[in-house]
């Protein structure tokens, strides 16, 4: 049983397959077609020091579908922090109010620090440009559900590969399976070499037009303005790539387009009505996956 979920590196292939199998068992409950109250009497503390819509609401939905309750602290409500309270003290206090904590924080390493100071399980919902393990698990779940497998997949990761914690987590997990990975990005947003060196997988840089007919999955990310050290660097790469329905004309019928959302202008709305779009389904899959994680750490 997991105590905390801080990094995707905390899990091996067997752990991942176990969570994905468990998530599938929760899908009917996630859709509201079946009732399950295994977390009745439990309270989840959502601590979001950065803005979030999908991740926070997904955890809240997952918890309530399982019969539990949620207390929320948003970035705007972090009053004690504004008054000078340390993160360690905040975690110690809040862990006395609930049975598990979900934390999102702008500083890389904050989630692991929180786990070291908490008396209850901690789940990382994103720490700066570091990790986002629950997003990775729902991404893997989406690929398995929509493509029917994880091994033997060819995937292209496109967009902001430098600052995206989603990509940094995902590529570590992809390397646990038999996948071919293409990296597509402006040079200024290339995946850091230390991350490439840290994974054992078939990885190469490419242009989308070179691989569009070959890939099974196109995973697109937005350029994250909030991660850039200065406005000028952001302006240089802003709008440097965009997927349209026309872009996908050469893709296999079975190829799927994924995106962790929110999108800005990197995926044109014309893609939404194509057979390739899976990003809204991907977002829903976050509920059963997070139900599986919550049940694992809280029971």
Curated annotation (Swiss-Prot):
L-aspartate binds at residues 83, 165, 222. InterPro entries: Asp/Orn_carbamoyltranf_P-bd (IPR006132), Asp/Orn_carbamoylTrfase (IPR006130), Asp/Orn_carbamoylTrfase_sf (IPR036901), Asp_carbamoyltransf (IPR002082), Asp_carbamoyltransf_Asp/Orn-bd (IPR006131). It catalyses: carbamoyl phosphate + L-aspartate = N-carbamoyl-L-aspartate + phosphate + H(+). Carbamoyl phosphate binds at residues 54-55, 104, 132, 135, 261-262. GO terms for molecular function: amino acid binding; aspartate carbamoyltransferase activity. Coiled coil: none annotated. Pathway: Pyrimidine metabolism; UMP biosynthesis via de novo pathway; (S)-dihydroorotate from bicarbonate: step 2/3. Its EC number is 2.1.3.2. Keywords: Pyrimidine biosynthesis, Transferase. GO terms for biological process: 'de novo' pyrimidine nucleobase biosynthetic process; 'de novo' UMP biosynthetic process; amino acid metabolic process. It comes from the Archaea. Pfam families: OTCace (PF00185), OTCace_N (PF02729). Catalyzes the condensation of carbamoyl phosphate and aspartate to form carbamoyl aspartate and inorganic phosphate, the committed step in the de novo pyrimidine nucleotide biosynthesis pathway. Belongs to the aspartate/ornithine carbamoyltransferase superfamily. ATCase family. Heterooligomer of catalytic and regulatory chains. This is Aspartate carbamoyltransferase catalytic subunit. It comes from Archaeoglobus fulgidus (strain ATCC 49558 / DSM 4304 / JCM 9628 / NBRC 100126 / VC-16).
């Amino acid at each position: 049983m997991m105590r905390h979920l801080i990094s995707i590196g905390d899990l091996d292939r067997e752990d991942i397959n176990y969570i994905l199998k468990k998530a599938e068992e929760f899908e009917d409950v996630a859709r509201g077609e079946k009732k399950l109250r295994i977390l009745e009497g439990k309270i989840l503390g959502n601590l979001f020091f950065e803005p979030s819509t999908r991740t926070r609401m997904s955890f809240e939905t997952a918890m309530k579908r399982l019969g539990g309750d949620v207390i929320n602290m948003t970035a705007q409500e972090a009053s004690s922090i504004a008054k000078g309270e340390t993160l360690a003290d905040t975690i110690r206090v809040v862990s006395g109010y609930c049975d598990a904590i979900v934390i999102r924080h702008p500083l890389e390493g904050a989630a692991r620090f929180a786990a070291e100071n908490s008396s209850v399980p901690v789940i990382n919902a994103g720490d700066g440009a570091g990790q986002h393990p629950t997003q990775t698990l729902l991404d893997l779940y989406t690929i398995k559900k929509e493509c029917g497998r994880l091994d033997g997949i060819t995937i292209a990761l496109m967009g902001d590969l430098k600052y995206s914690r989603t990509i940094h987590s995902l590529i570590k997990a992809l390397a646990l399976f038999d996948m071919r990975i293409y990296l597509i990005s402006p040079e200024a947003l290339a995946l850091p070499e230390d991350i490439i060196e840290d994974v054992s997988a078939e990885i190469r840089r490419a242009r989308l037009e070179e691989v569009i007919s070959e890939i099974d999955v196109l995973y697109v990310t937005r350029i994250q303005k909030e991660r850039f050290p200065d406005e000028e660097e952001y302006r240089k790469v802003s709008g440097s790539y965009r997927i349209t329905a026309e872009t996908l004309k050469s893709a296999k019928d079975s190829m799927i387009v994924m995106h962790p959302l929110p999108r800005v202008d990197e995926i044109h709305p014309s893609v939404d009505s194509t057979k390739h779009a899976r990003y809204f389904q991907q977002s829903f899959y976050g509920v059963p996956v997070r139900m599986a994680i919550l049940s694992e750490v809280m029971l």
